[in-house]
Structures are given as C-alpha cells and as structure tokens.
Amino acid sequence: MWCVAELDEEYIEKMEDVLKTYEKPYNPGEPVVCLDEKPVSLHAAVRPPQPAAPGKLARRDNEYERRGTANVFCAVEPQAGKHFTWPTPDRSAAEFAQIIGELTNHYPSAKTIQLVLDNLNIHCRKSLTDYCGDRGGGFIWNCLTPHYTPKHGSWLNQAEIEISLFSRQCLGKRRIPDLKTLRREGRAWNRRLNRACVKINWKFGRPEARKKFGYDKHLFKRSMGLVSSAPSSKCLSSFP
C-alpha cells in the first residue's frame, strides 16, 4: 500500500510533471532515465559454506561477520531497457557527481537527459559544481532536465522498481563481504539485463492519477493560489 501524506498543489504539480515525462514517446535524443540509490549491508561468512552435493543441499552457517555498509546507485531507461548500477563506498555529493558524469557519458549524442529523481539534498547542481568546479559541473548539469518527485512520492520513480529488481535478483539472500564483490556482482547483473533488454511497462499516467486521487487538474494552479477540494491524504490500495 502506498500512502500520500498530503495531496497539495506542490505534490500534484510535481506528480503531473513526472507522469507527463513518462508519457512522452520514446526519443533517443531525449532519453528518460530514472535514478535512485540504496544502502547495502556487507556481511562475510565466518565459516566457509558447504556446496551442494548429490543428495545434499547447500549449507551455510547462520553466523556472519558485519562488514559495514556500502551504497548502490541504480539508474534505468525504462523505454529502452538500459540498466546502470554503480556501487559506491557511501552516498555523498561527490559520489553523486561522479555517477552523473558517468551517466552523461553513456548518452553523448543526447540533446538532454530527462532525469527523474527524488529530493535528496545531494541531488542538485551544487554537488556537481563543488566536485567538478563551476564550469565543469555546470556543463554536466546542463546536460540534464531534472524532474523531481514530490515529498513522499518516491513511488513515482521507476528507479524504485529497478532497486527492487537489483535487491531480489542480484543480492538475494547472499552475503556480500565487500565493495569489490558488490561491484563485480552488479556488473554481471547489469550485463544480463541489458542483453535481454528488460523494459519497465509503466501504466500509471496522469488520467489514472486524476481518477485515483479525485482531483481536477484545472483547480491546481499555484500562481493563482486556488485550493482544491481534493482529500488531504490518500492510500493506493493497489498500484498501479
């Protein structure tokens, strides 16, 4: 169940912007890319696991050693089936700047990258200018057209689906002991998905949002200060 804390003008404005971006026909010159990140706990086995043998299941000890945490940036171009995974030591402004630089390198011919992301404080131009300088960071940022999801609206970011796939298909219940292993496994998972060209079939658009939340788009114009009679909060019992 997805819950919206407050359905106000700002929330609807940003939601409509993101959904409008998803509704655009596929255009390789303006790819729509969704980006998000997640922490990953690192665990090492205390005793070597026992592999499967004829008539015996694989076994591993319940005891493990904590090795701290890492971070994974996940990006996906849903319409093209392109997947990107960048494990990093942490989630910092410098790491974000490096990831954005690498992302833009994958689209050298794009007029702009329509980038969907949340409102995390490092998801901004300043992260790039602090790391790359005003000129270099500004140049990279200008390759993007950012679309921010509203607060408590992370469900609008298709990168959340990508993270879920990564967690289930790549990480699973395995123990990842270090960043090197995480990067190796992430690259292998990326290659499999990109070879298969796995796309995301997103079906929740602006018409569905207006029907689900019961608002009229014409009542939400921030410049006019109009207030809608739409409910202040709503839960999506089934999504999409």
Walk through the language-model features, giving the residues of each:
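RNase H-like polynucleotidyl transferase catalytic core
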Residues: 59-64, 136-158, 174-176
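C-terminal domain-tail junction helix/linker
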Residues: 5-6, 46, 181-240
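Extended, low-complexity cationic-aromatic segments
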Residues: 15-101, 213, 220
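Short Lys/Arg-enriched helix C-cap and helix-to-coil transition segments
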Residues: 1-13
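RNase H-like two-metal-ion nuclease catalytic core shared by retroviral integrases
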Residues: 70, 118-119, 146-168, 180
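Active-site proximal helix-loop segment of RNase H-like, two-metal nucleases, encompassing DDE(D)
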Residues: 80, 159-178, 192-196
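Mobile genetic element proteins and their domesticated derivatives, centered on retroelements
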Residues: 34-36, 75, 81, 100, ...
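Short, basic/hydrophobic alpha-helical segments
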Residues: 94-114
